[in-house]
């Protein structure tokens, strides 16, 4: 009967998709393996070779699976452009898919001293020397602990500077003259102060000040005040490139935004056969080390695919249109699944990590199509049972 033919056609398509599903699961295993940092270049190449073969086989299954000369998984005549899913590249923040081929991503707030993971690497957000100095100040109430490099101090709410044990610090001149006459406000501190007040000089002129402490701060020094911290970058002027001269993991906040934008582009370019993917700052400016505020505009990847195959199964004995059951099957090639040209070969495994997300999207598409076909098959089986019942009792 027509209904039985319908069941057979749906089972043919669903059986082929079972194999596609299995291949995607294997690709996921390979991508996870490639994301591990222990792989040598030859290992990743071997993994890439297998992924390429699996992608080719998925395309072959989509191209050749047919029932009664009807190709079930290659779509229908004509083409359409589809938007692929947006991805956050593993960054901490909020991703919003706008549904129109664009998405927005806003990073969680970052501040000086924070550790930020971008593209498989961990960076510390640095500051200028002046920004680090600005942390050193008297608290509104009580006392605050201050660490400058390897030196520890306390400052109370009156601005009094003390050592770690709470003893007030004083400047003692080498020649016994009064501090007021010989001390320059921010240049005479040594690395091992043991200040005292045994010279008989007025303490108001000799007490160490908050400004004196700030003189310790220079490029490469970390300042911790209470729960806040800042590492002064060695290229004080905000950096010609946003990266510390002596430590490539110490970067400015704006440099972090630039790097994040580049990773967003890498994650959202997978499967982009139409060249649509792009990432800009939230204010629509291009990514740069001295721009950005942590918000991004994403044009998602796009692919051109065949139109959805649609056909009707006529399961009744009369011409009533309610006797028709519609079957819709999307093309299931690598373009539609968003895995065309999938790459896992970069050095730090971030490409493989992004590939895992792309494969997950592909699995979701196959699962959705299998679910739809399963629903049609169940309906057809009930239809057949009811037709048998009508014949038997008529």
Where are these regions (language model features)?
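Primary detection of the long, small/polar-rich alpha-helical "axial" segments characteristic
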Residues: 1-394
């Amino acid at each position: 009967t027509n209904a039985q033919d319908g069941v057979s056609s749906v089972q043919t398509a669903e059986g082929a998709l079972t194999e596609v599903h299995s291949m995607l699961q294997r690709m996921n295993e390979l991508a996870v393996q490639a994301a591990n940092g222990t792989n040598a270049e030859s290992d990743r190449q071997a993994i890439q070779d297998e992924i390429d073969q699996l992608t080719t086989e998925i395309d072959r299954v989509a191209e050749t699976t047919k029932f009664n000369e009807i190709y079930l998984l290659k779509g229908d005549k004509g083409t359409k452009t589809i938007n692929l899913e947006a991805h956050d590249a593993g960054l901490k923040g909020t991703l919003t898919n706008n549904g129109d081929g664009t998405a927005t991503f806003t990073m969680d707030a970052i501040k000086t001293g924070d550790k930020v993971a971008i593209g498989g690497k961990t960076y510390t957000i640095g500051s200028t020397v002046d920004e680090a100095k600005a942390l050193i100040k008297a608290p509104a109430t009580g006392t605050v602990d201050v660490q400058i490099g390897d030196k520890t101090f306390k400052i109370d709410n009156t601005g009094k500077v003390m050592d770690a044990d709470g003893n007030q610090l004083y400047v003692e001149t080498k020649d016994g003259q009064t501090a007021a006459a010989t001390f320059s406000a921010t240049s005479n501190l040594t690395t091992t102060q043991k200040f005292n007040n045994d010279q008989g000089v007025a303490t108001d002129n000799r007490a160490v000040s908050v400004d004196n402490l700030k003189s310790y701060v220079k490029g490469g020094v970390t300042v911790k005040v209470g729960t806040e911290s800042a590492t002064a970058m060695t290229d004080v002027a905000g950096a010609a490139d946003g990266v510390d001269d002596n430590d490539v993991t110490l970067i400015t906040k704006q440099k972090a935004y630039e790097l994040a934008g580049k990773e967003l582009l890498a994650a959202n370019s997978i499967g982009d056969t139409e060249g649509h993917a792009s990432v800009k700052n939230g204010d629509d400016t291009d990514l740069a080390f001295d721009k950005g505020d942590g918000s991004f505009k994403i044009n998602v990847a796009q692919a051109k695919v065949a139109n959805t195959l649609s056909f009707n199964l006529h399961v009744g004995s009369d011409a009533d249109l309610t006797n028709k059951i519609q079957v819709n099957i999307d093309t299931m090639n690598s373009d539609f699944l968003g895995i065309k040209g999938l790459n896992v070969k970069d050095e730090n495994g971030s490409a493989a990590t992004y590939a895992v997300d792309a494969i997950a999207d592909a699995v979701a598409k196959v699962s959705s199509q299998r679910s739809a076909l399963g629903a049609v098959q169940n309906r057809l089986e009930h239809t057949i049972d009811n037709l048998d019942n009508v014949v038997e009792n008529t």
